[in-house]
Amino acid sequence: MTTFVHNDLDVSAANVVASGQPLYPAVERTSAVAAIANHANSSPASAEQRAAIFADPGFGKYFTDNVVRAVWTKSEGWHQAELVSGSASAGGLGINALHYGQSIFEGLKAYRHADGGIYTFRPEANALRFQRSAHRLALPPVPTDLFIGAIEALVRQDQA
């Protein structure tokens, strides 16, 4: 089991927590998370379409070709993770129920560098924030392995 801690100070909820102190109950990292099944979009945006989108991306205007979704049950926790077409989500990714219902948003960007590699910055910190948000909303926290595995699967698919 790994205890997740914040690197700096946390001033949220009028609580200052010194560096190195657990912020929330430990969330177990599981090595039992199965590989993410790949059912990617068979007709993703073309290079020209992507270039136009990246020139003026906006917010909530364009959606990704693919998403990772998983099922949660009390008996198994998070399981059946799969990369699927973004349009495969019921009603699409822009529906109000998804954005105004009880949900969590955690932003993370992956950047391509001059050496051709793709980098993210501290995805473990994003996973921790996502877990903390889940605790606040009484939702089951997503294990760090699954969170980062989903990011890796999406980045691999998008660079293909």
Feature map (PLM): residue ranges:
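Conserved alpha/beta cores of soluble small-molecule-handling proteins
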Residues: T2-A160
